[in-house]
């Protein structure tokens, strides 16, 4: 009789503990990321359309073709080229190794101007540069191609970064120079050091010109982050890398300036300036492109004809990857959209959490 009376009590106690566990201990299921295809277009001799007012325009460069497309999947410009080309969302130019006085055009194929020099044009958004023959000098141009100022050096330029107000260049001897875009004056000249064989393999400068991040050296290669104090750069963070990268690599400040990403052999590092935290994420292949939006950082890495897109959340965690085979590829972002170019196609995916 006593046993029968105790059974309901056991059931009640078990139910209470189960309910308390559900309330206090159970964690909600993680949200899954959904990739929704919006459209896919061919860039093989496409029909050319006009962009509507306010329609977002982006560039593509796949193999020996380049051009512009819109967020709604319209190709508005398509060019093939036998030799060399430079392109940004604002300008493009087709040229060869002997080119002089190089014409360049807007994203609507309208003549923009002529770069009054011989060399290799380089566009970053609406900024225009030309690297001069020899690889140790460059010029900054205005919107018509006229030379504004020129840096003439004797050491090979091994890394380069440009923002609206400042330009930074890294050199084979391990030095970094920062130039004022308005005047061309050299404001900073320093060497991160710390390695047996100094060379700057990758760098980026923050939009306000206050921070410079770089990967430098061989034999004890390291990543450094420096901050401008008056007319000097002070290293505020550094870490030695566990492997040496034998090639030029990417360093990238995020748009909000709070994080900087750097790629080296076998990994990507993410340094959070606000949290003073350095996170390492294994990425086996060389990263060739970094794009971002408000929620994610997308990285495109390459090993021969195998491309991998890695998605990093703003908590510096790798949320997922996917791979594909191609001879050439690119990625681009706009809001929640991810654009993937592959050989002769471009796809738009909407990325969301469910």
Question: For each predicted feature, which ranges?
Answer:
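Acidic, serine/threonine- and glycine-rich low-complexity intrinsically disordered segments
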Residues: 158-276, 280-281
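Structural motif
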Residues: 63-68, 99-105, 135-139, 174-179, ...
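Blade-level signature of beta-propeller repeat domains, shared across WD40, Kelch, NHL, RCC1
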Residues: 326-354
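Repeated scaffold domains used in trafficking and secretory/extracellular systems
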Residues: 43-53, 78-91, 114-127, 152-164, ...
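Non-cytosolic head/periplasmic domains of membrane-anchored proteins
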Residues: 90-200
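Hydrophobic beta-strand positions that form the internal "hydrophobic ladder"
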Residues: 57, 92, 128-129, 167, ...
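A short beta-strand motif characteristic of beta-propeller blades
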Residues: 32-43, 72-81, 106-116, 145-152, ...
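N-terminal "mature head" segments of proteins
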Residues: 1-115, 138
């Amino acid at each position: 009789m006593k046993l029968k009376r105790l059974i309901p009590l056991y059931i009640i106690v078990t139910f209470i503990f189960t309910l308390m566990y559900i309330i206090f201990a159970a964690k909600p299921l993680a949200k899954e990321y959904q990739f929704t295809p919006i459209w896919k277009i061919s860039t093989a001799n496409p029909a050319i359309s006009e962009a509507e007012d306010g329609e977002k325009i982006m560039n593509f460069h796949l193999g020996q073709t380049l051009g512009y497309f819109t967020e709604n999947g319209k190709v508005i410009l398509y060019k093939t080229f036998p030799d060399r080309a430079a392109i940004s969302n604002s300008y493009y130019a087709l040229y060869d190794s002997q080119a002089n006085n190089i014409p360049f055009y807007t994203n609507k194929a309208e003549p923009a101007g002529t770069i009054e020099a011989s060399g290799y044009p380089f566009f970053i958004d609406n900024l225009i540069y030309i690297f001069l023959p020899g690889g140790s000098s460059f010029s900054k141009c205005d919107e018509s191609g006229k030379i504004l100022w020129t840096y003439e050096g004797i050491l090979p330029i091994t890394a380069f970064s440009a923002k609206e107000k400042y330009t930074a260049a890294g050199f084979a001897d391990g030095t970094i120079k920062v130039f004022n875009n308005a005047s061309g004056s050299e404001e900073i000249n320093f060497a991160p050091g710390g390695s047996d064989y100094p060379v700057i393999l990758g760098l980026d400068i923050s939009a306000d010109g206050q921070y410079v991040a770089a990967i430098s050296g061989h034999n004890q290669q390291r990543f450094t982050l420096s901050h401008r104090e008056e007319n000097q750069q002070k290293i505020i963070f550094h870490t030695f890398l566990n492997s040496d990268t034998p090639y030029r690599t990417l360093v990238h400040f995020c748009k909000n300036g709070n994080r900087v990403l750097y790629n080296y052999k076998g990994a990507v590092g993410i340094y959070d300036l606000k949290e003073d935290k350095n996170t390492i994420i294994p990425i086996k292949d060389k990263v060739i492109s970094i794009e971002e939006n408000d929620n994610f950082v997308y990285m495109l890495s390459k090993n021969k004809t195998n491309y991998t897109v890695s998605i990093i959340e703003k908590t510096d965690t790798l949320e997922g990857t996917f791979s594909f085979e191609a001879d050439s590829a690119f990625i681009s972002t706009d809001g929640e959209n991810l654009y993937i170019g592959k050989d002769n196609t471009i796809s738009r995916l909407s990325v969301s959490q469910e």
